[in-house]
UniProtKB/Swiss-Prot annotation:
Name of the gene this protein is made from: atpG
Source organism of the structure: Bacillus cereus (strain ATCC 14579 / DSM 31 / CCUG 7414 / JCM 2152 / NBRC 15305 / NCIMB 9373 / NCTC 2599 / NRRL B-3711)
UniProt main location, coarse: membrane
Family affiliation: Belongs to the ATPase gamma chain family.
Protein name: ATP synthase gamma chain
Subunit structure: F-type ATPases have 2 components, CF(1) - the catalytic core - and CF(0) - the membrane proton channel. CF(1) has five subunits: alpha(3), beta(3), gamma(1), delta(1), epsilon(1). CF(0) has three main subunits: a, b and c.
GO biological process: proton motive force-driven ATP synthesis; proton motive force-driven plasma membrane ATP synthesis
Chain segments annotated as coiled-coil in the UniProt record: none
Amino acid sequence: MASLRDIKAKINSTKKTSQITKAMEMVSASKLNRAEQNAKSFVPYMEKIQEVVASIAQGSKGINHPMLNARPVKRTGYIVITSDRGLAGGYNSNVLRTVSNVIRERHNMDSNQYSIIVLGRLGRDYLKRRGFNIIDEVVGLSDHPSFTDIKDLASRAIAMFADGAYDELYIYYNHYVSKISQEVTENKILPLTDVASDKPTTAYEFEPSEEEILKVLLPQYAESLVYGALLDGKASEHAARMTAMKSATDNAMEVIDSLTLSFNRARQAAITQEITEIVGGAAALE
């Protein structure tokens, strides 16, 4: 049985750990509130640009643009959004496991059939260790990234599609459902074959021409899909870390309660033993 000193040391150590996890939970909760606002505030912009693109696509059937046209798929590109830091429950492992399984099933790990663009240090390290074909990466993004932080990568991804480096582009990330629920999501970024909206489209007059507008607008729309997924993923990351730290804090408190009970029992046993020895000694003197 552990000594009173050992039990007391474990209690103090666990209390310090619980203080750290509690602080991390509070920090993550604060970051989550801002990340939620960032993700929500970007949605109207993304919806409006989709509306304009849909209006052009539906109103001008003769327009031919490479980003709108499907082509035979010989190679597929994947954008994978993960985090730079851990301690976020299954946030990274869920999306990485999904992507790994998809690539094994669809491409049998043949690097000539796929390529990966990865965001986040943990995702990069995981995929590199397992021999996946990574062609671009971004690490060190802030907890609240701006569009500028991701624009270069998104532009490169779109340019590679236009240059024929791959024939379709998917993005994988954790979609934020609620503070306790996030789900791995796959979205097709390119080609933009489903830009049509179910909502009634507004009639626009375009100057100089619809074709010229699309040349500018389509890359911006594709970039907005990447950025929107990143904001969504960041909200999921903070939510997952907050939940993980709360669970760790709760577990630590349970351990402290159990150790405190063991400490009290051990101390009671020690006191009982001392009393027994005193009584026994007194009886021997009589």
